[in-house]
Each structure stands twice: as C-alpha cells, then as structure tokens.
C-alpha cells in the first residue's frame, strides 16, 4: 500500500520546491520506490528534480483524440490509452515521474485530471510512496484530485495573506469531506522566526500542526541555475527543515523509513 502525500498551496509559496525536498528525503531515507506526480498544468516539478519532461498527460490526450481511429488491432480504446499513458512515465533510480501538463489550447483540466487520477491510482500499488504536487490554489480540491491521502501538506509563504489561503484550503477540505488522514501546514521562506503578525493570524484562525522552512539561499541558487534540488547538500537549511518534518511525520504515523530523528522542525 502506497503512502500518499499531496502538496497544495497558493502560487509563489514554494510548494514545488517543498515537494522536491520531500522526494529527496524519501530517496535517502525511504524503504521503496517513489511515484512523483506533477498535477500542475504549469508543470515544473521535473525541472526541480533534474528530469527532462518531453511528454505529458495533456499532450498525450490531444494526440490520442486525433489518433484514436488508428488503434492497433487487438487493442480497445482503453487498453490503447493505458499503453500511451505508460509511455509518458519518466523513470530514474528509485523515482518515476508522471506530468499532467496541458493540451494545445485547452483551458479545461477536468478531463486530464480525471485521467491522471485514475492512472495514478492504478500505478500506486507499485510504489512505496506517492508525492503529488498540485496546481496552485484550490481548484484541485473541488475536482477531488486531492483525497485519499495520508498527508496533505498545505504550503504558505511567510505572510498573513498566505495564512488566510491556508484557512480557505482547510475549510474546503472539510466542506467537501475529502479523505485526508493528516494535514500539515508548512510556512516557507521564514527569515529567522515567525513574524508576530503571522503568529497572530494563525491563532485567530485556529491553525495548528505547523512546520516552518527558513529562507535558503542555496535553494534560490539551485533554482536560478536549473540544478536539481535533489543534489542540495545535507547542510542546506531547507533540506534540514524538511528532513525534520518528514521524520516527525513518520514517527507520528508509525511508518518505517531508514532515517533517524532530527529536532529542528517547529510544530
């Protein structure tokens, strides 16, 4: 049974970087292969992982719609679609990536999301961990792309507006009765400590189960130079913070990883 983590948050919160560092932790400390899913039409998880993405679910569906009259003999429409979907999996050591992307000129992502979710569900049993980087905002929640997950990581930048977005995401999860075993709010880009105004807003909205990730010049430099965040050194401040929160998560869940306990995550 795959352990499923979904990463959500508003645009600019650094959710893709957090997803990449979660994957980095699992590669180093996990006990099995990882399926990474970039469910954001504005796909860039592959770049953060140092993987070249040439084909996506969106582009494949466009081609499939044009070519479905040429389904090979002995295959039906669904089996041919499954075959084409398997072609877009990018394989690397301990990690496979599937990217949703977008079709040519299509503005509606409901169908690609549905196909991606069904495909990911069918693949999950082959992986110890699944990490899904969702599109910015809350639309993926209303489409129920994000449910049946063990951990929902809601990412905010270090701002009052970001914290209010977190509250709206949590409210929508509750209203839609999505199946989420545990939620963790992660405040990214924290300078030295949480600003009193941010703390006040967290208290006002009743948001708890908090982890923080400090500003990290190394992450900025790696992104700037299109270097894989998987190659960040263990001394990176962001790496250490994500390692801590992941270790604490698995300790709470009673889930086995190879890693030891760290103590700098702020809950």
What spans do the regions from the language model cover?
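Residue-level preference for the first positions of well-ordered beta-strands
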Residues: 4-6, 33-35, 95-97, 129-131, ...
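Conserved catalytic-core segment of NTP-binding enzymes
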Residues: 111-212, 221
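Active-site signature of alpha/beta-hydrolase-fold catalytic machinery across serine-
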Residues: 21, 25, 48, 144
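Short glycine/proline- and acidic residue-enriched helix-loop micro-motifs
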Residues: 69-71, 100-104, 228
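Walker A/P-loop phosphate-binding motif and the immediately C-terminal alpha-helix
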Residues: 3-41
């Amino acid at each position: 049974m795959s352990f499923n983590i979904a990463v959500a948050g508003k645009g600019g919160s650094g959710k893709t970087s957090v997803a990449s560092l979660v994957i980095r932790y699992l590669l180093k400390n996990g006990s099995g292969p990882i399926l990474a899913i970039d469910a954001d039409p504005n796909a860039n998880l592959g770049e953060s992982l140092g993987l070249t993405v040439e084909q996506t679910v969106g582009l494949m569906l466009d081609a499939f719609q044009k070519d479905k009259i040429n389904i090979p003999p002995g295959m039906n429409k669904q089996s041919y679609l499954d075959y084409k979907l398997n072609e877009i999996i990018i394989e690397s050591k301990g990690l496979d990536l599937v990217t949703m992307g977008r079709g040519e000129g299509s503005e509606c992502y409901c169908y690609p999301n549905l196909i991606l979710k069904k495909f990911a569900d069918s693949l999950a049993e082959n992986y110890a961990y699944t990490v899904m980087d969702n599109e910015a905002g809350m639309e993926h929640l209303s489409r129920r792309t994000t449910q049946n997950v063990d951990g929902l990581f809601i990412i905010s930048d270090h701002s009052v507006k970001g914290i209010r977005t977190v509250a709206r995401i949590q409210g929508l999860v509750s209203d839609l009765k999505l199946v989420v075993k545990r939620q963790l709010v992660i405040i990214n880009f924290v300078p030295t400590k949480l600003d009193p105004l941010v703390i006040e807003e967290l208290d006002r909205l009743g948001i708890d189960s908090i982890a923080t990730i400090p500003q990290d010049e190394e992450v900025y430099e790696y992104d700037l130079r299109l270097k894989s965040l998987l190659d960040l050194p263990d001394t990176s401040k962001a790496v250490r913070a994500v390692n801590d929160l992941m270790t604490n998560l698995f300790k709470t869940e009673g889930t086995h990883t190879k890693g030891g306990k760290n103590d700098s995550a702020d809950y």
